[in-house]
Amino acid sequence: LEIEAVKKVRESYHNLYVMIPFVRTVNEMIETKRLLEAEGLRQSPDFKLWMMAEVPSNVFLIDEFIATGIDGVSIGSNDLTQLILGIDRDNQKLAEKFDERNEAVTRALERIIKACASKGVTVSICGQAPSVYPELTEKLVRWGITSVSVSPDMIDTTRQLIADVEARLSTTPRPRTA
């Protein structure tokens, strides 16, 4: 049903991308691509296939997910944090332990971002983290994130922070390789 809806929209609008949520296994991504292609929805410059990185298996298997030929990855930091830490962010007793800056979470973010950046795959992050923790946003930029989503009240602040970090990165000498 969802694929039929996407096809119908594509008849009139050619700037539609598809983002697949909660992809647990590489085979699920392969099967999803097969189903889309069987319905005539093939990747092209105006039809991109993205996946959400929201579950720990995405972290461990990011290279394999990239190898399926996806065009982009959007990290769902709220769900990924919740599932890595085993904390229900809506549970009042546990909410204070929900923290995207936890080392396990930041290592996961770094792994996904660096893998995507090294293979030329667009990588973004959605969730509250970039709006709440500027120090985390700086790390995301250093690791090679392509874009971040923030709450409307943080757009200007985050834009300036990213510009500052990118300026520092562009003036930092890079090690020479043989």
Protein language model annotation of sequence segments:
Residues 1-178:
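Conserved alpha/beta-domain cores
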